[in-house]
Amino acid sequence: GWPAYPGSNGIRSSVCQKKLGCGSKNLASLGVCKAFCLGRKRFWQKCGKNGSSGKGSRICNPVLAHAVEKAGKGLIKVTDMAVAAIVKYAGKK
C-alpha cells in the first residue's frame, strides 16, 4: 500500500533536512541532502496523501513512494561514505 503521508509540515524541506541531520556530520552531504528533501517535497506535493492528486502521473506509485521515504534514511550514510572515499582518493594525488 501507500506509505503514511508525512503531513504538510512533514514534507517541508527544512523539516526533512533537520530529521536527516543534513550536514551535521559532514558538510559535503548538505547539498545532496537539500536536493533530496526538495525532491521529496515536490513528490508529496504532486502525489498527495495516496497518489490521488497526481492522477495519471507515473511517479505517483506506491513503490516509488516507499523508496522516497526509505531513501532519506540511507541517503546520509551513503553520501558520507562517498564523501569519505572522494577525500581519500583526492589525498592520493
UniProtKB/Swiss-Prot annotation:
Localized within the skin and proboscis and are most readily isolated from body mucus secretions. Keywords: Cytolysis, Disulfide bond, Hemolysis, Secreted, Toxin. Disulfide bonds join C16-C37, C22-C33, C47-C60. One of its GO terms (cellular component) is extracellular region. GO terms for biological process: killing of cells of another organism. This is Parbolysin P5. The keyword Secreted applies. The keyword Secreted applies. GO terms for molecular function: toxin activity. Belongs to the worm cytolysin family. Cytolysin that shows hemolytic activity (on bovine erythrocytes, HC(50)=5.75 mg/ml). This hemolytic activity is completely inhibited by small unilamelar vesicles composed of PC/PG, PC/PI and PC/PS in 1:1 molar ratios (with at least 100 mg/ml concentration). It is found in: Secreted.
